UniProtKB/Swiss-Prot annotation:
Belongs to the glycosyl hydrolase 51 family. It comes from Aspergillus niger. One of its GO terms (biological process) is L-arabinose metabolic process. This is Alpha-L-arabinofuranosidase A. Keywords: Glycoprotein, Glycosidase, Hydrolase, Signal. It holds the Pfam family Alpha-L-AF_C. It catalyses: Hydrolysis of terminal non-reducing alpha-L-arabinofuranoside residues in alpha-L-arabinosides. Residues 1-25 form the signal peptide.
Length: 628
């Protein structure tokens, strides 16, 4: 995680929001009586595998192209070592899901170590933890097998182990190894698997679905990278929407995300061509998403395919009777998640290692069906899926993938929600501040995706604009139930969308927290359960605010969307002390990236005089006053 540092262009005094006396400042008076309820799960995460945020990102498996998956397999990331060559072998399948394996052809006069290497996803992050590797091998061989992690350019070894293994040409056998490592200075590390060339000379060996894991979050098998999971945990989000997003839709009905192909052993998962230009291994599958929720204390929000592929791909949308097999598939998925072991799919879940049903309460039907030709048919499709799911699971909250009335049934079913997405310019987000004041309050809202766009990195102007937008929906969080910034994660080496909340490379600890990350963290970690009335002698703009309470604690969130300092008095009867957290920079274009960290929050303890706090808010600033 990036350490706190001084902000450029703002003095340390301003950073700490030094107390000032200014009779002409803006006055905010927070009522301690009454108020509207605020959703307890307001802030959370939207995740799909974009920007190698899953494979190569938060998913712990580090080898790229581990199983040569897909109908057009290739040797991306693989290379030969020593007196040998490698090739794709489609005649020695590992399983029906993994029809191709790597054939290692060893020279007749081979000596020394021969084998194969994998470069990972633009490197391998060796962090000094214990590593675990597994692989399948077929071919007549009895001898040493060595697994090493070695510097790509330096040859420095960061960890290794050697085992003795016997395999035959008849069947694949699996081997697993564990070994300690020392921390590498960067991600330029290769995975190397070798056999004794003098023993294997003149023969060939096949290798299938190789894996490499370091320590995982909460030691989950096939789990998450702790470095990224910890950063998310620091935000204290409340929910996780998965698996997308566009990556749920796919480019055709056949290419959609298929839940039943993401479960079981890794060698039984065929993977799929993802929507964001690269193949998904689906090692991060249905079980792993629910364990992610369990381990970070998140409410799962499951997206299901609803007969519409991205941009009407593959002759979708499907309607009428053509939807029946896909509705049945969703019902099977829900039985897998929620059914006890007396049910067909609940028993299958238990056989895959999860005896107890998961606690799923929310399902979203489709993704952005207002786009790409989906709107006209969505009312029919939503109703068909809603009716079937609600009949079988009446307690589930079902969410429409759009809030646009033209795409929805004339009357939404009681208890259903709608999903509102907003990617916009900074001024566009600020312009939406009042949008949520005027909602039909009988239909709850999920803001499933939002952020500033059309820039490489979140900057202060955009992050303050997002804060204004967030203040707008938090003021209305009796009807706005959940909201998530998107996209969440970004491997710097392979990016399909910017800006993103959190960036990283494969160098250990190389994580870049954006200005927008800090806004999300500040707002999520400081939440009340009741939104309080605030009276002021000023209109909204350029200063925006919202106040909430939880018991005797009060939270006032502020955003200064402008270039002038704002002097403030904030009155909260009965309070005496508070903590001020501020993110600010006088340059609206200031940003954090992989090459610089210019803007981080600062905190100070402040005292009230008769329940009144007096301070100044710098230009282009987001602040939270937590008082009691």
């Amino acid at each position: 995680m990036v350490a706190f540092s001084a902000l450029s262009g703002v003095s340390a005094v301003s950073l700490l929001l030094s107390l000032v006396q200014n009779a002409h400042g803006i006055s905010l008076k927070v009522s301690t009586q009454g108020g509207n309820s605020s959703s307890p799960i307001l802030y959370g995460f939207m995740f799909e595998d974009i920007n190698h945020s899953g494979d190569g990102g938060i998913y712990g498996q580090m080898l790229q192209n581990p199983g040569l998956q897909g109908t057009a397999p290739n040797l991306t990331a693989w290379a030969a070592v020593g007196d040998a060559t490698i090739a794709i072998d489609g005649d020695s399948p590992l399983t029906s899901a993994i029809p191709s394996t790597i054939k290692l052809n060893i020279a007749d006069d081979a000596t020394g170590a021969v084998g194969l290497t994998n470069e990972g996803y633009w490197g391998i992050p060796v962090d000094g933890s214990e590593f675990h590797s597994s692989f399948w091998i077929k071919g007549d061989y009895s001898g040493d097998i060595t697994v090493r992690l070695v510097g790509n350019y330096t040859g420095t070894e960061y960890g290794s182990t050697t085992i003795t293994h016997t395999s035959t040409a008849d069947n694949f056998t699996q081997a697993s190894v564990k070994f300690p490592t020392t921390k590498a200075p960067d991600g330029n590390v290769l995975y190397e698997l070798t056999v004794d060339g003098s023993v294997a000379a003149g023969s060939s060996l096949n290798f299938g679905y190789l894996t490499l894991f370091g320590e995982t979050y909460k030691s989950r098998e096939n789990g998450l990278k702790p470095q990224l999971a910890n950063v998310l945990d620091d935000m204290k989000g409340s929910f996780l929407r998965f698996p997308g997003g566009n990556n749920l839709e796919g480019n055709s009905a056949e290419n959609r995300w298929k839940w039943n192909e993401t479960i079981g052993d890794l060698c039984d998962r065929p993977g799929r061509e993802g929507t964001w230009t690269y193949y998904n291994t689906d090692g991060l599958g249905l079980h792993e998403y629910f364990y992610w929720c369990e381990d970070l204390g998140l409410v799962p929000v499951l997206g299901v395919w609803d007969g519409f592929a991205l941009e009407s791909g593959g002759n979708t949308p499907l309607t009428g009777d053509a939807l029946t097999p896909y509705i049945d598939d969703v019902l099977n998925e829900l039985e897998y998640i929620l059914g006890d072991t007396s049910t067909t799919y609940g028993a299958w879940r238990a056989a895959n290692g999860q005896e107890e049903p998961w606690n799923l309460t929310m399902v979203e039907i489709g993704n952005e069906d207002m786009l790409g030709g989906g709107c006209e048919s969505y009312a029919e499709r939503f109703t068909a899926f809603y009716d079937a799911i609600h009949a079988a699971y009446p307690d589930l909250i079902l969410i429409a993938s759009t809030s646009e009335a033209d795409c929805l049934p004339e009357s939404m079913p009681e208890g259903s929600w709608v999903d509102y997405h907003d990617y916009s310019t900074p001024d566009g987000l600020v312009g939406q501040f009042n949008y949520f004041d005027n909602l039909n309050r009988s239909v709850p809202y999920f803001i499933g995706e939002y952020s500033r766009w059309e820039i490489d990195w979140p900057n202060m102007k955009g992050s303050v604009a997002e804060a204004v937008f967030m203040i707008g929906f938090e003021r209305n969080s009796d009807v706005v139930k959940m909201a998530a910034y998107a996209p969440l994660l970004q491997l710097i080496n392979s990016t399909q969308w910017t800006p993103d909340l959190i960036g990283y490379t494969q160098s250990p600890g190389d994580i870049f927290l954006s200005t927008s990350y800090y806004v999300q963290e500040m707002f999520s970690r400081n939440r009340g359960d009741t939104i309080k009335e605030v009276t002021s002698d000023s209109d909204f703009g350029p200063l925006y605010w919202v106040a909430s309470s939880a018991g005797d604690s009060y939270y006032v969130k502020l955003a200064n969307y402008g270039s002038e300092t704002q002097d403030l008095t904030v009155s909260i009867p009965g309070t005496s002390t508070g903590k001020l957290t501020v993110l600010a920079d006088s340059d609206p274009d200031a940003y954090n990236s992989d090459t610089q960290t210019l803007v981080t929050p600062s905190e100070s303890t402040v005292q009230a005089s008769n329940g009144t706090f007096t301070f100044s808010l710098p230009a282009w600033a987001v602040a939270v006053l937590a008082a009691n």
